[in-house]
A protein has these predicted regions:
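Charged, glycine-rich intrinsically disordered N-terminal tails and low-complexity linkers that flank
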Residues: 1-69, 163
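Short intrinsically disordered terminal tails
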Residues: 1-2, 212-216
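Alpha-helical structural motif
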Residues: 3, 39-44, 70, 74, ...
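Intrinsically disordered, low-complexity boundary segments flanking structured domains
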Residues: 7, 34, 73-75, 144, ...
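Nucleic-acid nuclease catalytic cores
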Residues: 64, 82-104, 108-210
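Gly/Pro/Ser/Thr-rich low-complexity, intrinsically disordered segments predominantly at protein N-termini
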Residues: 66, 70, 75-77, 81-85
Length: 216
């Protein structure tokens, strides 16, 4: 059984230092990337992006900015229901392969089990099992996180907004929330995880071949 202290010892850079955080994420496969590949994304394209000279291709938009702004508040709501969960911002490495990476939004011990939380904001209903939830691949993202951190379950927390960015009284573009934060427990799915590992290892094989060709 993996302890929380053992998991925390595998933590790397925090997104508070964006350059270090991005540099560390480029060395392996993150949960978002593992989800993308498992849903049919191009292994070759992602491998090239990893190997080519580093650049920050991240392009923020109002939805991502809103999610980042709301995350600490949603985390506080989650902690009201799950007080053992603490907000987290670091990159974690797997004990079995340090190129398997994940950055959960919350982590904590639930008795002898390890729990995570993943936080999202959306204009859509993200109830697990709904068509929109299934289309996002968030289920796979959470499975990869649980695998990397040896967690037993993940609390999926989401907050819905009305997607109207023109009504804020202070003149700043922000939507209004239309539902309280919703939380659903997602259990670990070993069959899904095993399938994702197969895809991840194919990705690393391609990535290593590209690096070898560039050095030859």
């Amino acid at each position: 059984m993996t302890t929380l202290n053992e998991i925390l010892a595998r933590a790397g850079a925090s997104d508070a230092n964006r350059d270090e955080w991005l540099a560390e994420r480029r060395l392996g496969l993150t949960a978002t990337e593992a989800k993308h590949l498992y849903m049919g994304g191009s292994i070759d394209e992602l491998a090239l992006l990893k190997v080519l000279p580093a650049s920050d291709n991240f392009k923020p938009n109002k939805y991502l900015s809103w999610g980042k702004e709301r995350e600490p508040m949603i985390a506080r709501d989650v902690a009201m229901e799950y007080p053992f969960l603490a907000h987290e911002s670091r990159v974690f490495k797997s004990a079995v392969n340090d190129r398997y990476l994940a950055s959960p939004d919350m982590i904590g011990p639930d008795g002898d089990r390890i729990a995570l939380a993943e936080i999202k904001t959306s204009k859509h209903d993200l109830t697990p099992g709904s068509l929109h939830f299934d289309s996002t691949g968030y289920y796979y993202q959470m499975q990869w996180q649980m695998f990397v951190l040896d967690a037993d379950y993940c609390v999926f927390a989401w907050e819905r907004h009305h997607d109207d960015w023109s009504t804020c009284p202070d003149g700043v573009q922000r939507p209004q929330t239309i539902d309280p934060v919703q939380c659903v427990v997602i259990d670990r799915d070993e069959d899904c995880i095993n399938g994702m590992i197969v895809v991840a290892d194919k990705f690393f094989k391609v990535m290593d071949e590209i690096q070898k060709d560039l050095l030859s």
